[in-house]
């Protein structure tokens, strides 16, 4: 009985090898043929623009606060009309784990993940992307969304003087 087990244990792996020898290979020659990632694949991060063509990022620092590995950094600045923007924006992809928490935290939908997965390089400084490398020309996944149409720019007039706003109630007039 032991001899039969030994023979079977020797011949069975050869049979499996012969069976797979004449099948088509399942590996893909990567540089020549690129696979299409899944629809919800989380790849390289990009900064998008609003429908008016301006940057969506308002430098609120929510993305950098949500990042568990602290790979996002930026400097906030303000334009003359009161609109905030990121003076510089930097993502270190050597630290990024592509979790997507930064895109969920972004209130303006400025930071979005693409299906781009080719980020390999031999130089460490080439995986640190600056704002000009992250900013794309399009609106990204939510083309119709415009944060400033919904949120507006900072209020400078007193309460009740803005369009569509009622004047505040005088609470002292309600006292006896």
UniProtKB/Swiss-Prot annotation:
EC number of the protein: 7.1.1.-
Gene3D superfamilies registered for this protein in UniProt: 3.30.70.3270
Superkingdom, natural source: Bacteria
Coiled-coil stretches: none
A GO cellular component annotation in the UniProt record: plasma membrane
UniProt remark on cofactor binding: Binds 2 [4Fe-4S] clusters per subunit.
SUPFAM superfamilies assigned: 4Fe-4S ferredoxins
Localisation: Cell inner membrane
Pfam families given in the database record: Fer4_7
Catalytic activities: a quinone + NADH + 5 H(+)(in) = a quinol + NAD(+) + 4 H(+)(out)
InterPro entries: 4Fe4S_Fe-S-bd (IPR017896), 4Fe4S_Fe_S_CS (IPR017900), NADH_quinone_OxRdtase_chainI (IPR010226)
Keyword Cell membrane on entry: yes
Binding-site residues, [4Fe-4S] cluster 1: 57, 60, 63, 106
Annotated GO MF terms: 4 iron, 4 sulfur cluster binding; iron ion binding; NADH:ubiquinone reductase (non-electrogenic) activity; quinone binding
Keywords: 4Fe-4S, Cell inner membrane, Cell membrane, Iron, Iron-sulfur, Membrane, Metal-binding, NAD, Quinone, Repeat, Translocase, Ubiquinone
Residue ranges constituting the 4Fe-4S ferredoxin-type domain according to the UniProt record: 47-77, 87-116
Described purpose of this protein according to its UniProt entry: NDH-1 shuttles electrons from NADH, via FMN and iron-sulfur (Fe-S) centers, to quinones in the respiratory chain. The immediate electron acceptor for the enzyme in this species is believed to be ubiquinone. Couples the redox reaction to proton translocation (for every two electrons transferred, four hydrogen ions are translocated across the cytoplasmic membrane), and thus conserves the redox energy in a proton gradient.
NCBIfam families: NuoI, PRK05888.1-1
Assembly mode: NDH-1 is composed of 14 different subunits. Subunits NuoA, H, J, K, L, M, N constitute the membrane sector of the complex.
PANTHER family: NADH DEHYDROGENASE [UBIQUINONE] IRON-SULFUR PROTEIN 8, MITOCHONDRIAL, NADH DEHYDROGENASE UBIQUINONE IRON-SULFUR PROTEIN 8, MITOCHONDRIAL
Protein name: NADH-quinone oxidoreductase subunit I
Organism encoding this protein: Syntrophotalea carbinolica (strain DSM 2380 / NBRC 103641 / GraBd1)
């Amino acid at each position: 009985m032991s001899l039969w087990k030994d023979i079977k244990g020797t011949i069975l792996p050869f049979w499996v090898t012969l069976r797979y020898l004449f099948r088509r290979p399942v590996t893909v020659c990567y540089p020549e043929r690129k696979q299409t990632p899944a629809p919800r694949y989380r790849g390289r991060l990009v900064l998008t623009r609003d429908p008016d063509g301006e940057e969506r990022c308002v430098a609120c620092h929510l993305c950098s606060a949500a990042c568990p590995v602290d790979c996002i950094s930026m400097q906030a600045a303000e334009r003359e009309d009161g609109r905030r923007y990121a003076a510089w924006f930097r993502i270190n992809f050597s630290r990024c784990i592509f979790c997507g928490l930064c895109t969920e935290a972004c209130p303006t939908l400025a930071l979005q993940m693409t299906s781009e997965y080719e980020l390999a390089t031999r130089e460490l400084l080439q995986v640190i992307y600056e704002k000009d490398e992250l900013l794309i020309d399009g609106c990204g996944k939510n083309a119709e969304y415009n944060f400033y149409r919904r949120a507006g720019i900072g209020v400078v007039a007193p309460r009740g003087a803005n369009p569509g706003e009622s004047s505040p109630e005088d609470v002292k007039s309600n006292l006896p």
